[in-house]
UniProtKB/Swiss-Prot annotation:
Gene Ontology MF annotations: N-acylneuraminate-9-phosphate synthase activity
Protein name: N-acetylneuraminate-9-phosphate synthase
Tissues of expression: Ubiquitous.
PROSITE patterns for the chain: AFP_LIKE
Catalysed conversion reaction: aldehydo-N-acetyl-D-mannosamine 6-phosphate + phosphoenolpyruvate + H2O = N-acetylneuraminate 9-phosphate + phosphate
Gene: Nans
Chain positions found as N6-acetyllysine: K61, K74, K79, K290
Function description: Catalyzes condensation of phosphoenolpyruvate (PEP) and N-acetylmannosamine 6-phosphate (ManNAc-6-P) to synthesize N-acetylneuraminate-9-phosphate (Neu5Ac-9-P). Neu5Ac-9-P is the phosphorylated forms of sialic acid N-acetylneuraminic acid (Neu5Ac). In contrast with human ortholog, has no detectable activity towards D-mannose 6-phosphate.
AFP-like domain: residues covered: 294-353
Length: 359
C-alpha cells in the first residue's frame, strides 16, 4: 500500500483516501486579481480540493536576456517577455489577499514556486504544500532546498526520464519523506497517445512508499478519469473561465462545466473501484434468485443410489439447491431419498455433503 501523507491540514492522500484534485489556475487569471478570485470560487464550487497558482520572482527565474527578448506571440501581454511575465505576476500582497480569500470560502490554496526565491516567499506564506513544476524537477539544488523546508511536496515529471526520477527520489526521500510524483507530459494541449498513463503503474512499482498522481494537459476529462482508475491519488488539471482568452494554457484547460464533470466522474470511479474481494453481493441476490442455476436430477434417482455425473444436469431450479460448481463433489455421494426426474437436488437428499447453496 502506498504511503499515506497529510498533504493539507486534515486532508490525507494515498492509500484508500479520495483522490486530491488540484485546480491549476496558474496564470490563466490574465493578471487580474478579481478574475483570480472568480477562479478560486469556481474551483471550490466545482468540488476541487485545492486552487493553485504559479509564483515567480522573475529576476531569479530568468536571466536578463530572457526577460529582454522581444515577445510577439498572439498571447503576449507586452513587447518583451519580461513585460509579458510582469503583467501576469501578482505581488506578495496580492498573494496574501488571494490566500485569505481561499481560506474564507474554504478551499486549500498553494502555488508552484517557479524559483528558489518564490519558494522562500511561499514558505513564509505558510502554504500547505509545495508544488514542483516539471521545469524544476531536475533542478537538484532547488529540490534540496525545497525539501529541507519540511512541507509536503507534489513533484511533476514532465520532460524527465525514469533515470532522472530515480535520482529525484533519492535526493528528496532522505530530506523529506512526505512527497509524491505526478506522471506528466509537458505539451499543451496533450495528444492522447503521449499521455503514457502506464507510467503511473511503473512509478507505483519503483516507488511503492509514495503516492503517485497525474498532471494532465489534454483536452476533455476521459484521460484524467482513467488515471484515477489506474491509481492516481493526486490529480491536477489547468482551469480557465474561457478557453478563447489570450494565453497559451487556456486551450488545454477545463472550463467550469468540465471541471465539475471531472470531479463528479472521479468520485464516481472511486466508488466503482470498490473492493478487490470477489463475492456474491447483496445487490446481486435478486438476480441470483431469478437466474442462478442449481444441480437438477437428469433422470429419476432412487434412494440408495450412488450419484454419477450422467444422472445430473444444471438448470434454473425451484427451489434453489446445490450451485453448479458443486456438481463434481456430488458425484460418488449416496442419495438418501428418491429424487424425481427434473427435481432440484437438495441438501437433505444427499448423504454427507456440506451445503453450499448460495443464499
Amino acid at each position: 500500500m502506498p504511503l499515506e501523507l497529510e498533504l493539507c491540514p486534515g486532508r490525507w492522500v494515498g492509500g484508500k483516501h479520495p483522490c486530491f484534485i488540484i485546480a491549476e489556475i496558474g496564470q490563466n487569471h490574465q493578471g487580474d486579481i478579481d478574475v483570480a478570485k472568480r477562479m478560486i470560487r469556481t474551483a471550490k464550487e466545482c468540488g476541487a480540493d485545492c486552487a493553485k497558482f504559479q509564483k515567480s520572482e522573475l529576476e531569479f527565474k530568468f536571466n536578463r536576456k530572457a526577460l529582454e527578448r522581444p515577445y510577439t506571440s498572439k498571447h503576449s501581454w507586452g513587447k518583451t517577455y519580461g513585460e509579458h511575465k510582469r503583467h501576469l505576476e501578482f505581488s506578495h500582497d496580492q498573494y496574501k489577499e488571494l490566500q485569505s480569500y481561499a481560506q474564507e470560502i474554504g478551499i486549500f490554496f498553494t502555488a508552484s514556486g517557479m524559483d528558489e526565491m518564490a519558494v522562500e516567499f511561499l514558505h513564509e506564506l505558510n502554504v500547505p504544500f509545495f508544488k514542483v513544476g516539471s521545469g524544476d524537477t531536475n533542478n537538484f539544488p532547488y529540490l534540496e532546498k525545497t525539501a529541507k523546508k519540511g512541507r509536503p511536496m507534489v513533484i511533476s515529471s514532465g520532460m524527465q526520464s525514469m533515470d532522472t526520477m530515480k535520482q529525484v527520489y533519492q535526493i528528496v526521500k532522505p530530506l523529506n519523506p512526505n512527497f509524491c510524483f505526478l506522471q506528466c507530459t509537458s505539451a499543451y494541449p496533450l495528444q492522447p497517445e503521449d499521455a503514457n498513463l502506464r507510467v503511473i503503474s511503473e512509478y507505483q512499482k519503483l516507488f511503492p512508499d509514495i503516492p503517485i498522481g497525474y498532471s494532465g494537459h489534454e483536452t476533455g476529462i476521459a484521460i484524467s478519469v482513467a488515471a484515477v482508475a489506474l491509481g492516481a491519488k493526486v490529480l491536477e488539471r489547468h482551469i480557465t473561465l474561457d478557453k478563447t482568452w489570450k494565453g497559451s494554457d487556456h486551450s488545454a484547460s477545463l472550463e467550469p462545466g468540465e471541471l465539475a464533470e471531472l470531479v463528479r466522474s472521479v468520485r464516481l470511479v472511486e466508488r466503482a473501484l470498490g473492493s478487490p474481494t470477489k463475492q456474491l453481493l447483496p445487490c446481486e441476490m435478486a438476480c441470483n434468485e431469478k437466474l442462478g442455476k442449481s444441480v437438477v436430477a437428469k433422470v429419476k434417482i432412487p434412494a440408495g443410489t450412488t450419484l454419477t455425473l450422467d444422472m445430473l444436469t444444471v438448470k434454473v431450479g425451484e427451489p434453489k439447491g446445490y450451485p453448479p460448481e458443486d456438481i463434481f463433489n456430488l458425484a460418488g455421494k449416496k442419495v438418501l431419498v428418491t429424487i424425481e426426474e427434473d427435481d432440484t437436488v437438495m441438501e437433505e437428499s444427499v448423504e454427507s455433503h456440506s451445503k453450499k447453496i448460495k443464499a
